[in-house]
Amino acid sequence: MKTRSGIQVVDSLASIPASDWDALAGNHPLLSHAFLHALHESGCASAETGWTPCYLTLWRDSRLAAAMPLYLKSHSYGEYVFDWAWADAYQRHGLRYYPKLLNAVPFTPVTGPRLLATNEADRRALLDAALEFARDTGVSSLHCLFPVAPEVAAFESAGLMLRASVQFHWRNEGFSDFEDFLARMNHDKRKKIRQERRKVRDAGIEFRWLRGGEATQADWRFFVECYNRTYRAHHSSPYLNLDFFLRLARAMPEHLLLILGYRQGLPVASAFNIIGDETLYGRYWGTKEFHSGLHFETCYYQAIEFCIAEKMDSFEGGAQGEHKLSRGLLPQRTVSAHWLAHPEFAEAVTRFLRKEASGIENYVDELSEHSPFKQADHAPE
């Protein structure tokens, strides 16, 4: 058997043992072999949908030493860091922006490792190889979305431009229950949340928390129906399908939480969450009926109650959404890193990002002035 060594581009995780990949990914379910492979095998992240997998791997004596989730993209959908204006500018100047390379977890605005390695030298080797691959393939750009803080310096030192954005996260301050959480908030916000929750209860809606192994195929079918409704209500096409969720339910049930709302014994709303070591990741929701406050209850309040009950450190409620602030989710800075092959465009984007970063700082400062908590020590991170 031929020994695998050096940098290799792999088009499917089927050729990599799950245990080897997961040893590098650590305890990050959204970076796990099962999660990424399910995206590909279900057809959600594939060449047909504009997500051609080209995982960058580093091998020593046929053992996987480092890896980088990498995709050749023919569009900018499903990224949650918006570069549509850059693509438009390229087009106006007669230049091609697509294809581009994307180092990220598809459809997932969650911060996590992007250079999967056990030492700094291998991380740098991956990044150097990614830049070389970008130049060799002639793509317009390389984008690394939502890396962890230790990787940011490596991206910057390699010449990538950094871009800031903001999400809203909930932190568990050792709350004993939901009422203890509410007690830390100012009167108006506390009153509003209680009113929202009361409206849902008065509508006769009750909730169940189902771990992945407890949810039936009927539960998953109902959730996907709700998920599809949410996207279509916004005149968008759903990114994910039932096959993907069923694959996750089989491969990693311990990391899945399905929140289901019932009225008169029948399901009416649902939310899909990923359970990490210390963090709950809120991903998707939907409903068959409109009830005042149902969105906030299903997506946020039930998730917060789960985190308190399970003594989890935090809840990440997804991208954007200033409405989350008044529900106890505070602003959290996130970062992406970008390399553009065209020097003049790279210079123009650098200037743009400087101005944008200043605006982001002002935005975070403004949000912090409207914290829902009584204490003054809930500063943004």
Spell out what each predicted region is:
Residues 1-381:
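N-acyltransferase acceptor-side catalytic subdomain
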